[in-house]
Every structure is written in structure tokens, then in C-alpha cells.
């Protein structure tokens, strides 16, 4: 059989934006048969009894119908779980990625821009690019702290529509200084912009901004259930003042959360103590893994408030290939930003997975 031609017809190609043609689709690493420590997933599955109970519940859903008002039950449950302040509202997305894209869509005004520290989550820049908004990246300091002076200067110069602050940051896994964050939030507010605090890794962090967001009318708090333990469900949520959420919600596609997604999320929140225990295990394993990594000659490990640890090795490409050859999959981020030269991002797994990682890493250095 002749393989189909993979070259796009020039007449069709001209319909595709030039900047899109120059991009690459998001690549997912092949992980079959590997110890998978590349994507910051919860390493724990649901206990068998709960898995069976969830299966029965999903099997009873009317999949021939569009999602109904039960999605509002989920919104209320999430608001309760996150202790949403009075006068605030909550918006759901098909993962945080959709919420980030919808923010760019809603804030696409003439001269609008998006600002974020770098290195950071790639979707902040990508959403801006796809929406035709200017993206301003401000480098962190060499020890991955916010460069307050550079951030304030960029805010004053560009007056960004949206400023993202990941708390903790991906891929550096650290929580930034609270006073610096507050100064940035105030500076953005004076310029009439929005600040989005991205708490994707909140289940593993020692602090949250949730208790402080009611101080400001221009701050949104975004989270995801992916790190909670439901990466396969794809559900993110964003909280903010009611009037602000109401405007952004206008660009949300109808029925963007499937009945399967919101029923899984409701089930998880009903059993939140199970997921909280899993998160605490990850935090405990993170400490063990950090100490072991720090003891390896030639390895620099950074303290983490997430379910990942950033390390620097003598040769990232060699270490990555050595780990992959030994059936351990991690993320080589050494080309992502100059500050990340020879850096690898390791997801914290179970005790057994972390032991396999350490056994494979030492001979790979």
C-alpha cells in the first residue's frame, strides 16, 4: 500500500497563518514500559474499591444528553473546597490550558499584551502568540527568584493586560517572595491590568494565595485538578470577583466540561481525603528524593514546593539518554531557557519509582 503524501497542498497551506506554520505541535514522549516521571502526574491510582464505585457512577450517566445543571454542583463543590471568598465566582475550563487561552481571547484588545517571568509555563506565551497578543518575558534571577526591578520596569513600560505569576513556578518548583508578589500585583493594578496567580501545584505547596486574593479586584486565582490526581480528566478552574468572571465567561464555549469530567471531579471532591493523603505521601517522598539527589556528586538540586524537583547535571543530554535507556522517563528542559542550562525536571513518584530513578541516574551522569 502506498503511504499517503504528508505534504500539504500549497493552495491549502496559504490558508494557515505563517506563525502557526512555524510552530510545532505539542509532543508527548513515548512512555510505554517506562517509569514515567516526566509530566508531574500524581503517581497514585484510586484505591480499587473507589475505582469500581466511580465506574458504576459513570456508567449510569446519560451520555446521549448535553451536560446539565449538575455542572453547577461542581462549581459549588470547588468553591467550597477552595474556600472561595464572598463576592467571588468560579469558572471551569477543560484543563488550565483552556482557561489560559480564554483569558487571551477575552483580553485581546488593541495594544494588549501578556507578561510572565521566564522560565515559566509555556502556555502563557503560546496563548498570547495564537491570539496575536504581544508576549513579554522577564527573566528570573540566576537562583530562579523574581527579578523585582525588572518586573516592575516591564509593567511600567508595557502596561500588560495580563500578568501571570505561577505559585509555585513550573519548572523551577519554587514559591516566590510574598512581598515581591504583592508589589507586582499593586503595580499591575495601578496600570489597569489583571494578575493571574496560577496555583496548579497547590496540593504540594506550603502556602497558597487564596486567603489574600480578596484584597484585590484585579486578581484571578487559577488551579487544576490534574495535580490533585485527575490529569486524565482535564479540568481547571479559575476564581475571581463576580463581575470579572462574568465577562471572561462570555468567551467560554458552551458545554466545555463533559458529563464524564464533571462527574469524576465531583466524585474526587467527595473523597478529597484520599487525594490529600496521596499528596502528603508525594511531599514526604519529595524530601527523601531531594536529599538523595543532593548527595550525588555533580548534581545540584533546588528545593521544591511542587511535585517536581529541578536539578542541574554536568551533561543534561547524556543524563536524559542514560535514564531513558534504563527505562526512566524524565523531562530534559536544558534548551527551554538559558537559565536552565543542563537542567532536568524530575517528577516525584512513589518510593519505588524514585528508587528506580536514583539507581538509573547515577550511572547516567
From Swiss-Prot:
Q: Which residues carry this modification: N6-(pyridoxal phosphate)lysine?
A: 227
Its needed co-factors are: pyridoxal 5'-phosphate
InterPro entries, per this entry? Aminotransferase_I/II_large, HisP_aminotrans, PyrdxlP-dep_Trfase, PyrdxlP-dep_Trfase_major, PyrdxlP-dep_Trfase_small
According to UniProt, this protein's pathway is:
Amino-acid biosynthesis; L-histidine biosynthesis; L-histidine from 5-phospho-alpha-D-ribose 1-diphosphate: step 7/9
* Superkingdom to which the source organism belongs: Bacteria
Enzyme Commission identifier(s): 2.6.1.9
Q: Any keyword Transferase?
A: yes
The entry lists its GO molecular-function terms as:
histidinol-phosphate transaminase activity; pyridoxal phosphate binding
Query: Which of UniProt's keywords are assigned here?
Result: Amino-acid biosynthesis, Aminotransferase, Histidine biosynthesis, Pyridoxal phosphate, Transferase
Substrates-to-products reaction catalysed:
L-histidinol phosphate + 2-oxoglutarate = 3-(imidazol-4-yl)-2-oxopropyl phosphate + L-glutamate
A Pfam entry, by short name:
Aminotran_1_2
GO terms classed as biological process: L-histidine biosynthetic process
**ATP-binding as UniProt keyword:** no
Give the record's family classification: Belongs to the class-II pyridoxal-phosphate-dependent aminotransferase family. Histidinol-phosphate aminotransferase subfamily.
Oligomeric state and interaction partners are given as: Homodimer.
Q: Which NCBIfam families match?
A: hisC
Q: What is this protein called?
A: Histidinol-phosphate aminotransferase
* Source organism of this protein record: Polaromonas naphthalenivorans (strain CJ2)
Write the lineage as a comma-separated list: Bacteria, Pseudomonadati, Pseudomonadota, Betaproteobacteria, Burkholderiales
- The gene for this chain is hisC
